[in-house]
Structure formats: structure tokens, C-alpha cells
Amino acid sequence: MRLLLGIPYGDSRYFDFDVRLLTLGGECAALEKVAELGLDEKEKFTKAEQMLVDLAYLSEQLDIIGIAQDKLTPQFLLDNLATDDYVLITQAIADLRKKHIDAGESQSKVEAE
């Protein structure tokens, strides 16, 4: 898949990406990132803080080809990911989830026959 505007990193801009479903391990890693940001104890978030929480989860589901996974921190994504590309990535994750759900439903129908 390809980003519209890309993510700047170093002296380049990166466009190719892959997404994956959030696993339990990924959720735990995202929660650790939220804690590292000092946001795990807060009850009310500013818009930027809420986006950092969302990006902690997104970072566990996203690979930008050419950028090391450990560089894709919530703060890095907040500072460098364009809104259009954020929407594109979240839609790709939603499509992947739907694909997996649909595959499970079609398998259930076959088994029921």
C-alpha cells in the first residue's frame, strides 16, 4: 500500500506501508507506550494527548517500509503523519479487519452446509 503524502524521515520521504491486526501483545506494547508518555493515569485528555494514545495503538499495527519499527513512536507519528495519510492507514486497518471477519463468516457457512 502507498501513502498519499508520505512520512519524512532523515533526508527522505517514505510512502510504502503495511498494516496488521492488533494482537494482545501489540495492545500490551501500546499500553506501555501510553504509560511512557505519562498518560496512563489521566482521566481527561487534551486532543493532542488523545491522538497520542490513538497513535500508540496505530504504531503497533503499522509498518512504514524503510523506517525502523522502533522509530514509529506516537510522538514521531503525531509530528510527521499527515491527516490524509492517517485516514488512509486507519481505513486500511478497517478493511483488513473486515476481510478477516468476512473470511470467518464464509468459513462458518461452509462448515454449516
Regions found by a protein language model. Give the residues of each.
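Short, surface-exposed, charged amphipathic helix/loop patches that serve as local interaction elements
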Residues: 1-113
